[in-house]
Design a protein with these regions (language model features):
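Conserved alpha-helix/loop element of class I SAM-dependent methyltransferases that forms part
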Residues: 8-35
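Conserved hydrophobic residues forming the short capping helix/wall of the S-adenosyl-L-methionine
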Residues: 20, 24, 77, 179
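Conserved SAM-binding loop
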Residues: 27-145, 172
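Alpha-helical membrane-targeting segments
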Residues: 8, 141-163, 192
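Conserved small/polar residues in nucleotide/adenosyl-binding loops
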Residues: 2-9, 190-197
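Acceptor-substrate binding/catalytic loop of class I
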Residues: 137, 157-174
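Short alpha-helix
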Residues: 167-182, 189
Length: 197
């Protein structure tokens, strides 16, 4: 499982890096290419995405509602001398402040929130005018039920049973409506289980 997670994370990091570089027309050969980028990682967990973004020079803030995750992430960042700002917080609470971010990473979080509309609205308030939000979620299909719930939770036991509620998974069409109602433009939409839609 550890090796699979590392491969998945390295692919994800490369994808995020490429999208940020293209969006802001950054020279990838610069020593700290993201040094003018403010980045928010929503549901940052242990900081697996925050740390590589910080190493690229971004001014990184990571938020999570689980205090244990923030403590783990903070300790690891301190150990590696990375100036990442971690806090126990929600996007809904953070959106009440005046802070804006050039980049928001929103990876597999929406399927765990109770008010999806408020969540997307809060994210849109936090995103700077010319910013980019990179979003990943589980599509509500039979494939996702089989893989994310039956496979990961029940057969492999990688996550505790009940971690995911299939009814809270979101379809691309539902996501499009939410984004449009919050003046968020979709630049790229990719789904890996298109045969199930």
């Amino acid at each position: 499982r550890q090796r699979q997670m590392c491969i998945r994370d390295s692919v994800r990091i490369a994808f995020i890096r490429e999208k940020i570089i293209n969006h802001f027309n950054i020279n990838p050969s610069d020593e700290n290419p993201f040094n003018k980028i403010s980045l928010l990682d929503v549901g940052c967990g242990g900081g697996l995405l925050c740390e590589p973004m910080s190493k690229l020079g971004a001014n990184v803030t990571g938020i999570d509602i689980v205090e244990k995750n923030i403590k783990t992430a903070s300790a690891h960042a301190e150990e590696n001398k990375l100036p990442i700002k971690y806090q126990v917080n929600t996007v809904e609470e953070l959106a009440t402040k005046k802070t804006k971010y050039d980049v928001i990473l929103n990876m597999e979080v929406i399927e765990h929130v109770s008010d999806v509309s408020l969540f997307i609205k809060s994210c849109s308030h936090l995103l700077s005018k010319d910013g980019i939000m990179i979003f990943a979620s589980l599509n509500r299909t039979l494939t996702s039920y089989g893989l994310a719930i039956i496979g990961v939770e029940y057969i492999l036991g990688w996550l505790p049973r009940g971690t995911h509620d299939w009814n809270k998974f979101i379809t691309p069409d539902e996501l499009k409506v939410l984004f449009k109602s919050n003046q968020l433009k979709i630049c790229l939409l990719y789904t890996s289980d298109a045969a199930d839609e």
